[in-house]
Each structure stands twice: as C-alpha cells, then as structure tokens.
Amino acid sequence: MLTSGFLFSGSRSLFLEGLKNSFLDYRAVEVDGYLRENIKLWDKRSDITTEVNQKGAFVPEDKVEAFISLFSSFVGTLDTVVLSGRVPEGVRRDIYRILIERANEKGVKCILDGEGDLLLSGLEARPFLIKPNEYEFISAFAPKDGSLEEIAKRAKEIVRSGMTTMVSVTLGRRGALLTD
C-alpha cells in the first residue's frame, strides 16, 4: 500500500513517526507549514457532533503541479486509488478530476470520497465508485426529500448515467447504501 499527498514541514516528524511501524510506503511533495487539524466534539446527551476544522497551510501552485506529476509517475503501478477528503487551500478545485483522469489512462480504478465541488468535478472523470456520506450526497445531488428511497433512486440514476460504476452512501449508524 502507498499513501501520497502533501507533507507539511511543520508536521513532518508526526507524520513520519506514524508511518514508522506501518506497512505503508509514502510518496509526497513537501510544503512549508502545518497540516490542518480536525476536531470532533460529541455531546453524548444530545447525540450532537460539532466539527472544528482548521485551515492548515496554503499550498502554492508549483507544489500542486509537482504533486500531479508525482502521482502520474506511480499511479500505473497500482490497482486501485482512493481519493478522499478536503484539500488544502491553494489546491485547485478540479484536482480529483485530474487525478482520476490520470488513473483512468493507466486502467487504475478510482474510489472518490469527496464533497461539494470536489465530488462533482471528480465525477466528470468517471471514477469507479463514489462514497459520499448522506449529507454530502444530499447536498450534491438534491434527492427530492432526502429519504433513503430517494437517495437510492438518485444513486441508481447516477450509475445509469455512466458517471460511475457504483455509488456508496454512508448513513452513519444506519449503515450504508451501495448501488451499481
């Protein structure tokens, strides 16, 4: 397995320490600054989760282009690529589309777990599977009433359109919906 992305110099030792005893290889483009931190606060009584997401460091365009080049250099050696999460400030909003296109050129399956414009842009490149959570799916694809039946119907429409082979919508404690 391989992990790749931006390695922020201020968080370098933390990242490398985490990888030390893992089976993961990594290839990264180093960027000045610190990795953003995300904190989730869960109130057990009300069952409400509050997210506090920091911005993190800005990634200059030359580093983004260096990452696209790095990704292109190794993607053909992989069977499957997972592209997930938000991207740092400065990273172009069509980054997932570009990376999926590069992977598709090499016959590599892509799983896209993104939200908003990152998800919609990535979908243009026809990933093998998209995996938004319920909120992300409803926000991006606006099923009529947000019911499980409407989510399933809209997911099937997306697959039938040829934009992706499979859609998996995670539903928190209720599990997940998977359609092909």
Residue ranges: model-predicted function:
Residues 6, 30-31, 42, 53, ...:
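Short beta-strand segments
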Residues 29-47:
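Glycine-rich nucleotide/cofactor/substrate-binding loop typically near the N-terminus or early
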Residues 41-77:
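Conserved phosphate-binding/catalytic loop of the ribokinase/pfkB sugar-kinase fold
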Residues 55-57, 86-89, 136, 173-174:
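Short glycine-rich anion-binding loops that position phosphate/pyrophosphate groups of nucleotides
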Residues 75-90:
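Short acidic, glycine-rich surface-loop motifs adjacent to enzyme active sites
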